[in-house]
Swiss-Prot record:
Family named by the database record: Belongs to the bacterial histone-like protein family.
Function: This protein is one of the two subunits of integration host factor, a specific DNA-binding protein that functions in genetic recombination as well as in transcriptional and translational control.
Name of this chain's protein: Integration host factor subunit beta
Keywords: DNA recombination, DNA-binding, Transcription, Transcription regulation, Translation regulation
Residues making up the signal peptide according to the UniProt record: none
Length: 97
């Protein structure tokens, strides 16, 4: 599912909301999660999961085309850990359509 599909599904389930308003809400939520992560904060959505940032150490990588070794700088990467309720629902097939 892509963001536009998510927006459409939410709008379909909430006919009292305009599509453009749902899109603004979804964008605002994603922006706030991104801002929190960029500050190094953890974002927890109970029953769904938690977003956090992990640091990857600098390392020596390899160019897959040439095989040459290349230095890869230290970087921050987003990390998502599913919540217990989400895992249970997925394992029960609850979300299958």
């Amino acid at each position: 599912m892509i963001k536009s599909e998510l927006v459409q599904r939410i709008a379909d389930r909430n006919p009292h909301l305009y599509l453009r308003d749902v899109e603004k809400i979804v964008n605002a939520i994603l922006d706030e999660i991104t801002r929190a992560l960029s500050r190094g904060d953890r974002v927890e959505l109970r029953g769904f999961g938690a977003f956090s940032v992990k640091r990857r150490d600098a390392r020596l990588g390899r160019n897959p085309r040439t095989g040459a070794h290349v230095p890869v700088e230290e970087k921050s990467v987003p990390f998502f850990k599913t919540g217990k309720e989400m895992r249970e629902r997925l394992n029960e097939g609850y979300l299958a359509e």
